């Protein structure tokens, strides 16, 4: 999977939106694309059926990412979740991805089960760069889903653990069985924080980490894709991740 945001907001906008990036992604030999809700204008959100048609014509799979938390600060389910699930269905996405948010207890999970059953859409929850994306709450959520046999799996963002002060390797040890999608990126120290870089621009830690995660989980390229020939750059990393 190639995450459209890997090309940068400005590049996507200048190209004419996410739809304009699809031939690059397909031409690079990728299996699919992660469409990002935050990169849509209001008008573009109204053209999801046409975007879905283009994705299908190019032979790509799709997943859909909404920049939203599953749980609100008071612990309730995000009231916009049905809208995001519906948009994902319109795209014929394989799954909807959100961040965890403020997960406190199992009480809202039956309502979540009902929503997912009604929509027929798979849901994956990602560790983000907030306190809610730390290992401890992600573990609690994983355990609650297991106890309740809730069909929700995890997106493992390889780099985000560093932003929240956790060990990516420890996170992999605890969460790997529940991981169904991997956001691949390396991270290096930058101005007292971190920045995402391609895995072949960093040390072997990141490819070692990838080997701790399920081999059959789709891999999403979320590190910066830059250069004069974006198709060639994308193809390089699609091939790199297929080989690992």
What positions do the PLM features span?
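N-terminal pre-domain/capping segments
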Residues: 1-82, 89
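Active-site acidic/histidine proton-transfer and metal-coordination neighborhood
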Residues: 54-62, 70-153
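Short secondary-structure transition/capping segments
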Residues: 45-48, 75-77, 108-111, 136-138, ...
């Amino acid at each position: 999977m190639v995450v459209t945001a890997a090309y940068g907001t400005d590049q996507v906008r200048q190209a004419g939106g996410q739809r304009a990036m699809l031939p690059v992604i397909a031409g690079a030999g990728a299996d699919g694309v992660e469409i990002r809700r935050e990169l849509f204008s209001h008008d573009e959100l109204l053209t999801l059926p046409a975007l879905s048609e283009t994705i299908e014509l190019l032979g790509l799979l799709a997943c859909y990412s909404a920049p939203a938390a599953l749980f609100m600060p008071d612990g309730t389910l995000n009231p916009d979740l049905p809208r995001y699930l519906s948009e994902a269905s319109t795209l014929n996405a394989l799954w909807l991805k959100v961040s965890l948010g403020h997960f406190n207890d199992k009480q809202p999970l039956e309502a979540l089960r009902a929503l997912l059953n009604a929509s027929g859409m798979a849901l994956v929850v990602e560790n983000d760069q907030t306190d809610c994306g730390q290992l401890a709450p992600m573990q609690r959520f994983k355990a609650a889903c297991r106890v309740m046999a809730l069909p929700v799996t995890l997106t493992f963002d390889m780099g985000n653990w560093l932003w929240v002060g956790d060990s990516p390797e420890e996170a992999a040890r605890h969460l790997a069985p529940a991981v169904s999608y991997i956001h691949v990126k390396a991270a290096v120290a930058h101005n007292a924080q971190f920045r995402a870089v391609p895995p072949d621009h960093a040390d072997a830690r990141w490819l070692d980490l990838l080997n701790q995660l399920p081999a059959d989980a789709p891999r999403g390229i979320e590190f910066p894709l830059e250069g004069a020939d974006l198709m060639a750059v994308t193809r390089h990393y699609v091939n790199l991740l297929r080989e690992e």
